[in-house]
Amino acid sequence: MYAVVKTGGKQYRVAAGEKLKVEQIPADIGQEITLDQVLSVGEGDQLKVGTPLVAGAVVKATVLAHGRHDKVKIFKMRRRKHYQKHQGHRQNYTEIRIEAITA
């Protein structure tokens, strides 16, 4: 069984037992969280698509860790004007493990 959930403004296809990194969620390590924005649920060749959410569908997950992604370097330059600007960014994430999908 798999589901498509929305969290942090992004959509993820998840299945039970999977680990994934999502946008930072304010929860403690080891805490069980509920992802209730389920867009679709599928099993085998059956697919249930919500309008926009599947009624009664819930994905339960456990928070494993918090961290930061690798640095993304931004470099701006104006040719012939001796203008250069360096900038960096590291995005925070939360690593979760999908425990159960109920639909």
Curated annotation (Swiss-Prot):
GO biological process: translation
NCBIfam families (alphabetical): L21
Gene name per UniProt: rplU
One of the record's GO molecular function terms: structural constituent of ribosome
The keyword Lipoprotein is annotated on this UniProt entry: no
Cited HAMAP family: Ribosomal_bL21
Described function: This protein binds to 23S rRNA in the presence of protein L20.
The protein's name in its UniProt record: Large ribosomal subunit protein bL21
InterPro entries tied to this protein: bL21-like, bL21-like_sf, Ribosomal_bL21, Ribosomal_bL21_CS
Keyword DNA-binding in record: no
Quaternary organization: Part of the 50S ribosomal subunit. Contacts protein L20.
TM region positions: none
Entry keyword set: Ribonucleoprotein, Ribosomal protein, RNA-binding, rRNA-binding
Membership in a protein family: Belongs to the bacterial ribosomal protein bL21 family.
One GO location term (cellular component): ribonucleoprotein complex
Pfam families in alphabetical order: Ribosomal_L21p
